[in-house]
Design a protein with these regions (language model features):
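Terminal, low-structured helical/coil segments at or just beyond the last alpha-helical repeat
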Residues: 198-235
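N-terminal leader/linker segments that initiate helical-solenoid repeat arrays
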Residues: 16-44, 55
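Positively charged n-region of N-terminal signal peptides that target proteins for export
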Residues: 1-7
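Short helix-capping/linker turns of helical repeat alpha-solenoids
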Residues: 19, 36-37, 50-53, 66-68, ...
Length: 235
């Protein structure tokens, strides 16, 4: 499963707090955190988080999850993630899903992981879309549904997630959740390989051995079109 992504949080922070009357205090914490002064960030954000400031809650969760300026405390991270997630912050929902998925700071619970992944995935978080695809693919915390797995893999793949691109290739190769299609399998393996996913190039070449030259050319053309359109024209 995917881990927690700090860069996403820092980029979104100011947008969420621009209209807050406490934005100045939040900004002090943000500047401190960006310079590595998490002690000051904690001092600025904790009162805001206690008052319900959602991004202060989210960033506190990150600090406790990663041990930035505080003793690492997964249970405390879960507490703050949950508060932010319940206010609809997609990144918090996704990260809370990871905590439940891995049993980190909370009892492991596949159904809860699915619940939070779904909420985040529906808001467009690529890692949550991928993770939800995995849950459907494996029948973990939800009834196994290959077509639903393909749906979520596809959404994550179209955001550039190489693991999802590879997994769609495998689904097309096996005809799992989709009609079997070596051209599409080759296409997605090729895209995943171009994005650095280990073994995708090997699997692409293995399936190419079963294809005609015309089909290989078609798959390569589809891959180029998909990537050049920033995954908007992937067939």
């Amino acid at each position: 499963m995917f881990g927690l992504i700090r860069t996403t949080i820092i980029a979104l922070v100011l947008a969420f707090n621009a209209g807050s009357i406490l934005a100045q205090d939040f900004q002090k914490g943000l500047v401190a955190a960006q310079s590595g002064d998490y002690v000051t960030a904690l001092q600025e954000w904790l009162p805001l988080a206690d008052q319900g400031d959602v991004m202060a809650q989210f960033n506190l969760a990150l600090m406790y999850r990663n041990g930035w300026g505080v003793l690492q405390d997964y249970a405390e991270a879960v507490k703050w993630y949950r508060l932010a997630a319940e206010q609809g912050i997609a990144e918090a929902q996704s990260n809370l899903g990871v905590m439940y998925d891995n049993g980190t700071g909370v009892l492991q619970d596949d159904a809860e992981a699915v619940k939070w992944y779904r909420l985040a995935a529906e808001q467009g978080i690529a890692s949550a879309q991928y993770n939800l695809g995995v849950m459907y693919d494996n029948g973990t915390g939800v009834l196994q549904d290959y077509a639903e797995a393909v749906k979520w893999y596809r959404l994550a793949a179209e955001q550039g997630i190489a693991t999802s691109q590879n997994n769609i290739g495998a689904m097309y190769e096996k005809g799992t959740g989709v009609l079997q299609d070596n051209v599409r399998a080759h296409m997605w393996y090729n895209i995943a390989a171009a994005n650095g996913y280990e073994n995708s190039g090997e699997w692409r070449d293995q399936i190419a051995a079963k294809m005609t030259s015309a089909d290989i050319s078609k798959a390569q053309s589809l891959a180029r079109e998909c990537m050049s359109s920033n995954y908007k024209n992937c067939g």
